[in-house]
UniProtKB/Swiss-Prot annotation:
Keywords: Cytoplasm, Methyltransferase, S-adenosyl-L-methionine, Transferase, tRNA processing. CDD domains: TrmD-like. One of its GO terms (molecular function) is tRNA (guanine(37)-N1)-methyltransferase activity. Its EC number is 2.1.1.228. This is tRNA (guanine-N(1)-)-methyltransferase. The gene is trmD. Homodimer. S-adenosyl-L-methionine binds at G112, I131, G132, D133, F134, I135, L136. It is found in: Cytoplasm. Specifically methylates guanosine-37 in various tRNAs.
C-alpha cells in the first residue's frame, strides 16, 4: 500500500516511518509512505502556503495552488489514491473505517493547518475524516493515527495475525479482554487462576465474559450492534444479575 501525505511539515513523519512495525513494513516493501512538502509546490521566494480569508475572519487558510499542484504531481504519474482530508467535522475514524481503508491500494491524506484549507480543495477529496471531537494544531497527528491503524491491518505487517482478531473493536466490535504475563504474582496481585489452568475452552469462555463485561460497563452501545451468540446472551443475563464468572459456571454447568 502507498500513502501520500500532503503536509507543510514532512519531518513530522520521520520518527513514525522509522519506528516499530511501520518501519518493518516499509523495509519489507509492504508499505510505502511519501511525505509531500507543500512548500515545494509554491512559486514565490517565501514559499508561501497560506493566505487571508476572503470576507474577513481570524487566522489563515492553506492556499489551493500548492495542494492541487502536489495532487497533480502524483496523479500525473499514474497514481489513483483514495483522498482523505483531516477535518474536525469529518466522518469519525474508527476500526470499521480503518478496515475499509486497509483494502485500498493507495491513500492520500491532506493535512490541514491554520483555519483549514480553501474549500475548492474539497473537489479532489473522497472523504473528510475526524479522529475525535477536539481541535489539533494541524492534521499531521491525525494522519499518524490513521496510518498506524490502517497499516497494522495490512496482511504481512503484524507477525501474529491472530492477535488482530483479539483487539478491541475488531471482529465482532466488542472491547478487548485483559491480558497478563509473568510473574504469576506481583505485589500481591495474582494472574487469574483460569488463565494458568491449561483449559483452553474455559480460558476462551473467561475471555469472552471479560469482553462482554468490559463492553457493558464502558461502551454498552456496542453490545446493541454486536452479533451475539446464545452463550453471549447467557453471559449478559448473568452479569445483569450480578453473578461472578464462577457462579456462571456453576449455574450453567459449563
Amino acid at each position: 500500500m502507498k500513502f501520500f501525505v500532503l503536509t507543510i511539515f514532512p519531518q513530522f513523519f520521520e520518527g513514525f516511518i522509522n519506528t516499530g512495525i511501520v518501519s518493518r513494513a516499509v523495509k519489507k516493501g509492504i508499505v510505502d509512505i511519501k511525505s509531500v512538502d507543500l512548500r515545494d509546490f509554491t512559486e514565490d521566494k517565501h514559499r508561501t502556503v497560506d493566505d487571508v480569508v476572503y470576507g474577513g475572519g481570524p487566522g489563515m487558510l492553506l492556499k489551493p495552488e500548492p495542494i492541487f499542484k502536489a495532487y497533480d504531481s502524483i496523479t500525473e504519474k499514474g497514481h489513483k489514491p483514495y483522498v482523505l482530508i483531516t477535518e474536525p467535522w469529518g466522518r469519525k475514524f474508527d476500526q470499521k473505517f480503518a478496515e475499509e481503508l486497509s483494502k485500498k491500494e493507495e491513500i492520500m491524506i491532506i493535512c490541514g493547518r491554520y483555519e483549514g484549507v480553501d474549500e475548492r480543495v474539497k473537489s479532489i477529496v473522497d472523504e473528510e475524516v475526524s479522529i475525535g471531537d477536539f481541535i489539533l494544531s494541524g492534521g499531521e497527528p491525525a494522519a499518524l493515527v490513521i496510518m498506524d491503524a490502517v497499516i497494522r491491518l495490512i496482511p504481512g505487517v503484524v507477525g501474529d495475525s491472530e492477535s488482530l482478531n483479539a483487539d478491541s473493536f475488531s471482529n465482532d466490535g466488542l472491547l478487548g479482554y485483559p491480558n497478563y504475563t509473568r510473574p504469576a504474582e506481583y505485589r500481591g496481585m495474582k494472574v487469574p487462576e483460569v488463565l494458568r489452568s491449561g483449559n483452553h475452552k474455559l480460558i476462551k469462555l473467561w475471555r469472552r465474559w471479560k469482553q462482554i463485561e468490559k463492553t457493558a460497563v464502558r461502551k454498552p452501545e456496542l453490545l446493541k450492534k454486536a452479533d451475539l451468540s446464545d452463550s453471549d446472551k447467557k453471559i449478559i443475563d448473568a452479569i445483569k444479575k450480578g453473578l461472578s464468572f464462577e457462579d456462571f459456571l456453576k449455574k450453567y454447568k459449563v
